[in-house]
UniProtKB/Swiss-Prot annotation:
Gene3D superfamilies: Anticodon-binding domain, Bira Bifunctional Protein, Domain 2. The gene is hisS. This is Histidine--tRNA ligase. CDD domains: HisRS-like_core. It comes from Mesomycoplasma hyopneumoniae (strain 7448). GO terms for biological process: histidyl-tRNA aminoacylation. Its EC number is 6.1.1.21.
């Protein structure tokens, strides 16, 4: 079957117009916040050796059915990155970036072969923050920094409808005991489970707990809870975490079924869930937790780490739903009716852009009527143009909202005045 050339692949999209503008604004918020919290930017390849994403537990969803794997011309098995944490740990190990506690930030596209739907794509953007090689006794403070950072980002984005869910998965030993009990419990209900969950019973029963279909079933809601298997140390750690959240007046809800989709998480895990109904269902806007076992895969032992990642497309959808988004229009359009005027306006554009004004100009001469039609379509607030028999060194400036026309000295432009009329037009 012949594929249409004018369609992007299923599960992908093009950013343009309002979405592109919001994307740029959102990206700026993340870079600004990363700088404020002293996170260093790190960029890893879009594709890696596939084995950095593969685990002995092959039931992890992004491994079993969502990983984009391929062989290159030399027979090496590669994969498009489905998430950002494993590549960063690979980079940390490769470049020996582990002498002291490090704080990394990334922003870029990820790839998963999943069913496209609202808030889910096959190519999607994530912004992530990782704190690696921290001291064990500082866990609650690392968590506090991560949560405070998230709330600061939400504030800058104008997002205020969310709920923080938390859980504590304990260490590998305790979790193995819990998973064994969980598997025995779900065996009794195997005939009521979805096909993928029947496989999960033996491979990763934890994933049954947060499956969107399974979690609505009563017997899943009544499944054994992780907290009944906590050691005294686990209870003390969890109490310290919740106490510090309460001290900083951070609202949270304990969800013992919260496990996260990637199987390298342990200890503390969390998600911020959208409660605005913009996305249709209560999807996670950001999620993460501790991953103390993942570093061992890269030869890094006793390596405490915590991180989280935001789904950028979901943030954009929420921001788009708000009615108070202002389009960023041009400040000035420089209209030319002759080749000579085009050259003069290029010089003027350079001067105005240096002063951070938003400027565009026509590069083909137009008649007066067509020229002003073009200027209005550009969305500019004002248009500069030369009139016939105009006084030497002067140019006309027209307010496209009011129609007011005035003469400006071309050789001595008053930037303070231009700023004032731009602000006045924005408040009109």
């Amino acid at each position: 079957m012949k594929k249409k050339l004018n369609l992007c692949p299923k599960g992908t999209y093009d950013f343009f117009g309002q979405s592109a503008k919001i994307f740029i604004d959102v990206r700026k918020v993340f870079f600004d916040q990363a700088k404020k919290f002293n996170f260093s930017y790190i960029e890893t390849p879009i594709f890696e050796y596939a084995n950095i994403f593969l685990t002995t537990n092959q039931i992890a969803d992004i491994v079993s059915k969502e990983l984009y794997k391929f062989f290159d011309k030399s027979g090496r098995e590669l994969a498009l990155r489905p998430e950002g944490t494993a590549p960063i740990m690979r980079s940390v190990a490769q470049h020996k970036l582990f002498q002291t506690e490090k704080k990394f930030f990334y922003f870029g596209p990820m790839f998963r072969y999943e069913n496209p739907q609202k808030g889910r794509f096959r190519q999607f953007y994530q912004a992530g923050f990782e704190i690696i090689n921290y001291k064990k006794d500082s866990l609650e403070f690392q968590i506090l920094e991560i949560i405070v950072l998230i709330k600061s980002i939400f504030k800058d984005l104008g997002i205020n409808e969310y709920e923080l869910k938390i859980n504590f998965l304990s260490n590998l030993t305790t979790r193995n005991i819990y998973e064994k009990n969980l598997a025995q419990y779900f065996e009794k209900f195997s005939d009521k489970l979805e096909p993928i969950s029947k496989i999960r019973i033996k491979k990763n029963p934890l994933r049954i707990l947060d499956d969107k279909i399974e979690q609505e079933k009563e017997f899943v809601k009544l499944a054994p809870k992780i907290n009944t298997f906590w050691t005294m140390e686990d209870k003390n750690i969890f109490n310290r975490i919740t106490s510090i959240l309460e001290e900083f007046k951070i609202s949270y809800k304990v969800d013992y079924n919260l496990v996260r989709g990637l199987d390298y998480y342990d200890d503390f895990v969390f998600e911020f869930i959208d409660t605005s109904q913009t996305l249709g269902t209560k999807l996670a806007l950001v999620g993460g937790g501790c991953y103390n076992n993942l570093p061992t895969k890269f030869g890094l032992n006793n390596f405490k780490s915590i991180g989280m990642a935001f789904g950028i497309e979901r943030l954009i959808e929420i921001i788009k739903s708000k009615k108070n988004i202002k389009e960023q229009n041009l400040d000035f359009f420089l209209l030319s009716f002759t080749d000579k005027e085009i050259l003069l306006n290029f010089k003027l554009a350079k001067i105005l852009r240096k002063e951070n004004f938003l400027v565009d100009l026509n590069k083909t001469p137009f008649s007066v009527s067509k020229g002003f039609q073009l200027a209005k379509k550009s969305g500019a607030k004002f248009v500069f143009f030369f009139e016939k028999n105009q006084a030497k060194n002067y140019i006309s400036l027209k307010n496209l909202q009011t129609g007011k026309n005035e003469q400006i000295l071309y050789t001595e432009i008053n930037f303070e005045y231009l700023n004032s009329i731009i602000k006045a037009s924005e408040n009109a």
